[in-house]
From Swiss-Prot:
GO terms for molecular function: magnesium ion binding; monooxygenase activity; ribulose-bisphosphate carboxylase activity. The record marks 327 as: Transition state stabilizer. One of its GO terms (biological process) is reductive pentose-phosphate cycle. Binds 1 Mg(2+) ion per subunit. Its cofactor is Mg(2+). NCBIfam families: PRK04208.1. It comes from the Bacteria. Mg(2+) binds at residues 194, 196-197. This is Ribulose bisphosphate carboxylase large chain. The active site is at residues 168, 287. Pfam families: RuBisCO_large, RuBisCO_large_N. The basic functional RuBisCO is composed of a large chain homodimer in a 'head-to-tail' conformation. In form I RuBisCO this homodimer is arranged in a barrel-like tetramer with the small subunits forming a tetrameric 'cap' on each end of the 'barrel'. Belongs to the RuBisCO large chain family. Type I subfamily.
Amino acid sequence: MAIKTYQAGVKEYRQTYWQPDYVPLDTDILACFKITPQSGVDREEAAAAVAAESSCGTWTTVWTDLLTDLDYYKGRAYRIEDVPGDDARFYAFVAYPIDLFEEGSVVNVFTSLVGNVFGFKAIRALRLEDVRFPIAYVKTCGGPPSGIQVERDKMNKYGRPLLGCTIKPKLGLSAKNYGRAVYECLRGSLDFTKDDENINSQPFMRWRDRFEFVQEATLKAEAETGERKGHYLNVTAPTPEEMYKRAEFAKEIGAPIIMHDYLAGGLCANAGLANWCRNNGMLLHVHRAMHAVLDRNPHHGIHFRVLTKILRLSGGDHLHTGTVVGKLEGDRASTLGWIDLLRESFVPEDRSRGIFFDQDWGSMPGAFAVASGGIHVWHMPALVAIFGDDSVLQFGGGTLGHPWGNAAGAHANRVALEACVQARNEGRQIEKEGREILTAAAQHSPELKIAMETWKEIKFEFDTVDKLDIAHK
């Protein structure tokens, strides 16, 4: 039997952490990094350094390596690939044994995978492109508190996307006027209205006042329309204790859904709130405020598809995903990829959509994809085609900006939505025939006709910053 001996000193990372013959186990957590190495650092050494610094390695040999089974616990860089059209960077694939991570803790996973390694001097830039969570790890996570089907049953809404609106202006309204805006939107045929992500409890509108006026508006709209309605009450707060206090009050007054800013509020807080919602029968809408700080730079940070997976694991029934056609970043292929990761039970590897690994979610429920940001009635055909039924189409300015007011804007969006869904169900190509479909519907809806006239020239035609690397070929 060979005796382990300790040899002090510094050695190349590749000697321990580069293992090209390794075959990943079904239980391994797999990561794909895009690495920009410093000048003079070769690919194998850079990949091995990332594997080491994101698992159990450090800059020098330590004698305590002899007290554990380093060969079992270490991360392994097992494959390197070229980035299409980019000679300065490469993809490194790293496998981590599942026992490196606390069960059900996306916080712990992120602490390793996107921790100190992102400040490592040997790496000029580093981006986490994708992560494969094995089913053995998925089953330790709570996931969405309710999921798509349970929410549809609670709200009694089937066969179409849900329709929402973010109340504007996002800041400055009093609680009473805010409630009035909510009522007008909901009675105009919307399913949901929403707090903006930065509405918490400011001097112009304290949270308790907002909750009370909004719930009064919601119940009044329900009574008048005969439909279930809801408003996403943002319970994001300075402390977890205050967050739960607000959530409890929302439950007491009968609100069906609350909201959380999962990145700004923190993954730990989000997982805790998701558990609370599951135990208390509440729906949880999740906003992605702060995501672009992490994901928009194509060379450094965390890709949004990873943030999508993290949200599904930690818990949320809705997640904002971009629109493709609106004012926010997101190309079509990438967006379709992370929408599937949010909703489907199994998503196969598909490099054309930026998906590097098969992802099996087992029986974990899916979450609604939320399209929000600079959208109006002219976008409806494309939104229905891109997002499908299991989505929330959320028009803020595209509702409240209607010349005849909030209720008319809401009604215009509902007519446009139902016209597009009906046309799709009849087998029509709604993106190609969108103008014809909307024009026909507008003949019976003056609200839609005015909305189409108001926003006919509004487009957001800017180049996408974070493009799929496949598109660089």
